[in-house]
């Protein structure tokens, strides 16, 4: 597929996913947001104390895509509340968002058409990732924590990209030993406490101060 066709497809799906993401926020109760904020150290009593949009992005990622055992996720509640045409971009994208995966991703190389090829370090597989900001700034060997979804033949981020390094990952593991019983790395990646620990340590180390999230431009 030519570059222009790929990017047009990406921008269209990105716009759809942004709409779904905003709508899913409406399925969140304030208490649920506050609980996640406490996990990240972004709450003082009943008050949110996030200092940047980037910190709020981490908070909303956890609030939308994770939930306590026995509770439903906001993204799933939203999906059940809407009627979409089967096979439409809206339906395909929402289904992909419901199946989004968190992991540690290493930039392997540039994709021949657009974006990059990344390796899932916890599931031992590669995928084609389209993200304009990351494609312009990432170098091979760089590792990021992110939640990806696959609405097409390529993956997209769910808005969160956290640069990680060995010390931050080690701190995340020492943050809690609750998931160390997971012998299977995939179960570790699927455990919402792992994402929370990565995000919490990213905030505490100040790494999020150097991260800016931007939606892709409508046209080059």
Regions found by a protein language model. Give the residues of each.
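Short beta-alpha junctions and helix-cap segments that line functional grooves
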Residues: 130-132, 141
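Mixed-charge, low-complexity intrinsically disordered regions
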Residues: 1-113, 125, 136-137, 143-220
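Short aromatic-glycine-enriched beta-strand elements
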Residues: 114-118
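Short, structured beta-strand/loop micro-motifs enriched in basic residues and often containing a Trp
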Residues: 120-129
């Amino acid at each position: 597929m030519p570059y222009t066709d790929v990017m047009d497809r990406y921008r269209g799906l990105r716009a759809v996913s942004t709409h779904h993401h905003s709508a899913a926020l409406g399925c969140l109760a304030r208490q649920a947001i506050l609980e996640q904020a406490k996990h990240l150290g972004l709450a003082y009593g009943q008050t949110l104390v996030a200092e940047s949009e980037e910190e709020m992005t981490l908070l909303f990622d956890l609030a939308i895509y994770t939930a306590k055992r026995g509770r439903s996720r906001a993204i799933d509640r939203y999906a059940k509340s809407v009627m979409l045409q089967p096979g439409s971009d809206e339906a395909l994208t929402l289904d992909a968002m419901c199946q989004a995966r968190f992991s540690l991703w290493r930039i392997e190389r540039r994709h021949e058409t657009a974006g990059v090829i990344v390796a899932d370090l916890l599931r031992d597989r590669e995928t084609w990732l389209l993200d304009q900001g990351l494609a312009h700034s990432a170098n091979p060997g760089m590792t990021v924590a992110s939640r990806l979804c696959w609405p097409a033949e390529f993956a997209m981020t769910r808005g969160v990209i956290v640069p990680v390094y060995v010390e931050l990952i080690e701190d995340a593991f020492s943050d809690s030993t609750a998931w160390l019983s997971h012998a299977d790395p995939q179960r570790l990646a699927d455990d919402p406490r792992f994402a929370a620990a990565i995000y919490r340590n990213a905030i505490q180390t100040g790494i999020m101060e150097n991260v800016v999230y931007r939606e892709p431009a409508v046209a080059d």
